[in-house]
């Protein structure tokens, strides 16, 4: 991948993950061959590596509207974490790598109004919880 359009980089230690060709790719920080992490998830965006480097949260459009997905940072199957049917963007993680932070316009009258939420990074995802701050 010498030429291309690389978007939304996220870095943890010696690993860089980025979006290109509507998929997630991983490459060592010092350079080398990029490895495709996703395929068949529709358009993907906004990746965020967890602070411990074990997990990768991102937004995928496999079934239409963007939703939050989670996969091991090394690659493998992705799990859909939200079922909001509204626009969303992964913002990052809590420092302990247990909660994914994301913004969404679900439940808002104006589609441009977003709020910040968390969802557990565990297998079942858990409940979407609002972060007690103003609109994003």
Q: What kind of region is each of these model predictions?
A:
Residues 8-13, 47-55, 91-99:
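Blade-terminus and WD-like Trp-Asp/Gly-His loop motifs, strongest in beta-propeller folds
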Residues 1-2, 51, 84, 95, ...:
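Intrinsic-disorder/low-complexity regions
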Residues 12, 33, 52, 77, ...:
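Cysteine-rich, disulfide-stabilized extracellular repeat modules
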Residues 19-25, 39-44, 59-69, 77, ...:
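A flexible loop/linker signature enriched in serine peptidases of the S9 family
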Residues 1-29, 45-47:
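Beta-strand-rich domains and repeat architectures in extracellular enzymes and scaffolds
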């Amino acid at each position: 991948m010498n030429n291309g359009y690389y978007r939304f980089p996220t870095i943890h230690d010696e690993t860089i993950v980025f979006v290109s060709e509507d998929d997630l790719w991983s490459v060592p920080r010092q350079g080398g061959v990029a490895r495709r992490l996703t395929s068949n998830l529709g358009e993907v965006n906004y990746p965020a590596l967890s602070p411990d480097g074990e997990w990768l949260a991102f937004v995928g459009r496999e079934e239409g509207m963007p939703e939050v997905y989670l996969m091991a940072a090394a690659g493998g199957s992705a799990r859909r974490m939200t079922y909001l049917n509204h626009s969303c963007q992964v913002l990052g993680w809590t420092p302990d790598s247990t909660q994914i932070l994301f913004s969404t316009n679900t439940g808002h009258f104006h589609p441009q109004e977003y709020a910040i939420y968390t969802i557990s990074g565990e297998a079942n995802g858990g409940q979407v919880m609002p972060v007690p701050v103003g609109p994003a």
